[in-house]
Design a protein with these regions (language model features):
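Residue signature of alpha-solenoid helical repeat architecture, marking inter-repeat boundaries
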Residues: 31-32
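Amphipathic alpha-helical segments of tetratricopeptide repeats
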Residues: 15-26, 59-69
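Helix-turn-helix DNA-binding segment
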Residues: 114-145
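Residue register of alpha-helical TPR repeats
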Residues: 1-3, 35, 42, 75, ...
């Protein structure tokens, strides 16, 4: 539900849903926790709360890295709005490269479904970093941010 709220632009509610689910969990559920932290990161970025976004992304990374559960991170590259680059590119270059490869494969498949269904033609000639910068600019972020 947190992801659905995010997609509807209800970022505050999305964040609240994800954080409440994380607080109320009983036991360890790594896949669910990973997804909830990524959803919270996405919402925080849309709310321009970068510190909270990085904290949730860091928690997601702590869950994902030991077991190589990076597929979800790669699939959410665009929605994470630069967090992968900011948090992993320098400190974890090999993992970053693997995530970006996942992102390219996921995006290729997504465009093959999205373009015919929507009647729009989403371009594929930007790098992941260029795409992130363009998306942040479209959302009103400044270069300094």
């Amino acid at each position: 539900m947190a992801h659905a709220l995010y997609l509807r632009g209800e970022y505050g509610r999305s964040l609240g849903m994800a954080e409440n689910a994380l607080i109320m969990k009983q036991g360890s559920y790594p896949i669910s926790e990973l997804f909830l932290h990524l959803s919270a990161s996405m919402a925080c970025m849309s709310l321009k709360d970068i510190d909270a976004a990085k904290a949730h992304f860091g928690a997601a990374w702590d869950i994902a890295r030991p077991d190589g559960l990076i597929e979800l991170i790669g699939e959410h590259h665009g929605l994470l709005q630069g967090l992968i680059e900011a948090c992993l590119k320098t400190q974890y270059p090999d993992d970053f490269a693997r995530i970006i490869e996942i992102t390219y494969r996921f995006s290729y498949g997504w465009r093959r479904i999205h373009n015919p269904d929507s009647g729009e033609d989403v371009a594929d000639d930007l790098t992941t970093t260029e795409f992130t910068m363009a998306m942040l600019a479209c959302r009103g972020w400044t270069n300094a941010e």
